[in-house]
Amino acid sequence: MKIQLIAVGTKMPDWVEKGYQEYARRFPKEMQLELLEINAGKRGKNADIKRILKKEGELTLAAIPKGNKIVTLEVTGQAWTTEQLADEMGKWQLDARNISLLIGGPEGLAPECITKSEQRWSLSALTLPHPLVRVIVAESLYRAFTLTINHPYHRE
C-alpha cells in the first residue's frame, strides 16, 4: 500500500523536510509514504483568498491518483489515538487501495476537497502550522505502522 501525502505548499524550512524524511524512509516497500507538494497560491495584502483556495483545491484533487481513498486532515475530523490509527491503517490495507492524505495550506483545505473525502482525520483541536503537520503525520503513521507489526517503537 502507498500512502500519498498531498500537501499545499512548497519551499518548506529545512527542518520540515528533514523531519518528514526521517519517518518516511523508515517505512518498508510494502507500506510506502510519499509526499507530493502542491503550489500554494500567492498571498498578499489584496489576495482573493476564496479564489486561491479554489485553485489549490483543483490542483490537489487533480493530483490524486484514480482509485485512491481520500482522507482529509482537518480540525473537524475524527481524532484517533495511536492504537485507533493503527486499526484504521489495517482497514486501509484490507481495502486494497492506496491512500491520499490531504493537507491544506494556511487557510486549510478547499471545500471541494472536504466534500470528496471518504474519511476525515483530526490531529488536534489546536490550530497547527501546516508545515509542522507534515512531520506529525509522518511520525504518527510510522508509529501506528509499528504497532501493526509488533515493532517496539511505540511505548505505552
Swiss-Prot record:
It comes from the Bacteria. Keywords: Cytoplasm, Methyltransferase, rRNA processing, S-adenosyl-L-methionine, Transferase. It catalyses: pseudouridine(1915) in 23S rRNA + S-adenosyl-L-methionine = N(3)-methylpseudouridine(1915) in 23S rRNA + S-adenosyl-L-homocysteine + H(+). SUPFAM superfamilies: alpha/beta knot. GO terms for cellular component: cytoplasm. Belongs to the RNA methyltransferase RlmH family. S-adenosyl-L-methionine binds at residues 73, 104, 123-128. It comes from Psychromonas ingrahamii (strain DSM 17664 / CCUG 51855 / 37). This is Ribosomal RNA large subunit methyltransferase H. Homodimer. Its main location: cytoplasm. Its EC number is 2.1.1.177. Disulfide bonds: none annotated. Specifically methylates the pseudouridine at position 1915 (m3Psi1915) in 23S rRNA. The keyword DNA-binding does not apply. Pfam families: SPOUT_MTase. It is found in: Cytoplasm. One of its GO terms (molecular function) is rRNA (pseudouridine-N3-)-methyltransferase activity.
